[in-house]
C-alpha cells in the first residue's frame, strides 16, 4: 500500500488501539484480510508521529488541569520492552485527573497520563510542578514528599486520602478471617458513606455543612474506635497491619470534612485507570519508553473525550486535520476535547 495515511486512517488506528484495546498486530491482521498490507511496525510509526504532533494539545490540557483547586492522582504499571535485555521492564503511567461534577464545579472533567520508567515519588513531584491545590491520592508512600516544605515545583500540597482504600483493607481481613473487629469497622465506614450518597451533586457549601453535622461525629467516633482496637491486637497481625495503615493516613482521611469540594475517596481516578489496565492486558507491553509516552498522550485525549461525552474518533480526526492544516499554536486551547464541535 503506497502513499500517506489520511488523518481519518490514523485516528482509526489510535481509537482501535487505545479506546477499543485492539493491539497493532491484530489491526494489521484485520487490514490484511481486506487486502491492505500494513505491517504493525508501520502502524506503530503512525502512532508515534501522531503522539508527537498531539503533544501541544496534551501539554495545554495538562496546564488546564494544574490550574485546578483539587485534583486526583493514581498510578498503574505499564510494561515496556527493554531493548538492551530483550525483556520487559516495569514502567508506570500516572493519571492526573479533574472531576468536579459531584459538587457542581464548572470546569470540565479531564485526565492526563504521564509515563515514567519507575514508581519513585520524584516522578509525581515532577508531573505536579506548578500545582498547589488539594491532591486526592491513595496511601502510596511515594506521595509523602509532596507534603514537605522541601517540595520541588511548588508549595507543600495538602492531601486527601481515600476511605475506599481504608474500607478495602478491612474487607481483606474480614473476607479471610471473618474478624468481628473488621466487620465493625466496615459498618462504621458504611455509615460515613451513607452521608455522601445523600449529598452528591449539591454545592460545596451544602456538602461541607452536611459533613460537619453528620459525618464529623461519625469520623470522630471511628477514630476513637480505631485507637481502642489497635491497643487490643498485635501490630504484626493481619488486622493490626490494616488498622495501622488507617492510623497512618488519619489526617488525610479527615480532609474531606473541611472542604466540600473534596471527595471521600479516590474512586474517580481509579475508574480512569481501568482503560490503561485493559490496554495493558491486550497489548502486553509498549515497545520502548517513547511508546509509553505515546500511550499516555493518546490515552489522555481519548479518555478526556469519553468523560466529556465527545466521540474520540471524530475528535482525533478533526484535531489531526487541524494540526496538519497549520492550526496556530496560540489557539491550541480550541483543540481541547471539551471545545470540540462535531461537523454536521
Q: Positions of the model-derived regions?
A:
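Catalytic center-proximal scaffold of phosphoryl-transfer enzymes
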Residues: 1-344
